Swiss-Prot record:
Matches recorded under CDD domains: SAICAR_synt_Sc
GO molecular function: ATP binding; phosphoribosylaminoimidazolesuccinocarboxamide synthase activity
Protein known as: Phosphoribosylaminoimidazole-succinocarboxamide synthase
Assigned GO CC terms: cytoplasm
Keyword Protein biosynthesis: no
Pathway field: Purine metabolism; IMP biosynthesis via de novo pathway; 5-amino-1-(5-phospho-D-ribosyl)imidazole-4-carboxamide from 5-amino-1-(5-phospho-D-ribosyl)imidazole-4-carboxylate: step 1/2
Family, similarity comment: Belongs to the SAICAR synthetase family.
Amino acid sequence: MELLHSGKVRDVYADGGDLILVASDRISVYDVVLPTPIPDKGKLLTALSLWWFDQLAELVPNHVLSATDVPPEFAGRAIRCRRLDMVPVECVARGYLTGGGFAEYQRTGAVSGVELPRGLVEAAALPEPVFTPSTKAPVGEHDQPITFGGVVDRVGAETAERLRRITLDVYRRGAELAAGRGILIADTKIELGWAADGTLTVGDELLTSDSSRFWPVESYQPGRAQFSYDKQYVRDWATRSGWDKQSPAPELPGEVVDATRARYVDVYEKLTGKRWG
């Protein structure tokens, strides 16, 4: 196998005509990879992605060829995938106003050019989910919000419309399934690419704790920060630490590592109904 790319979290290998996508235990916040791994994180992301790919298979095609036909040293954290020509934008859907989206709304009254009602508070539910794309930055650089017009400039109007529709369809269906299991999906990012037959296909990961914000339904209360089953916990620690959000990043304390792993395990078990390990 040939290593083609080492990303913030995943390594991509070529194996004949297929790709082997390996999820590491690395974690990144603010587009910077932290030096401290989260044990089992790669396996948890892979298992949850596979569950979601199966749940949403009738809604949108995905890149999975096999979860078992992978090198033994990568068992549990790798997927054999079809090659995709990836779209050069990050496709983001938001159903709740939080994080960078809330900060942008406070400045402008909009998110990625989408005008929103006045007076919304932190974690407010939006009237309808919105498509808020961003650039796809290299490792070490920051993704930047772009408008729908910016997507049109990059991929054309027809493809931009399809990206928006698929992203919002995935979000709505995922949010519906998760709500029935006690989880709110505040927002999520998906990556799409063209398969060899010209089909727009979901790649990378799907509705995981790295790509989404997950909140417990039972404690949801707009107007404040929410308990989260995702890497928001690490983002919050990084902000409190005084780190300037530039590389190199500080080591994570042991208690932050343990609490982060516990969150990833909890949401996997709540969503899938399966016991981890």
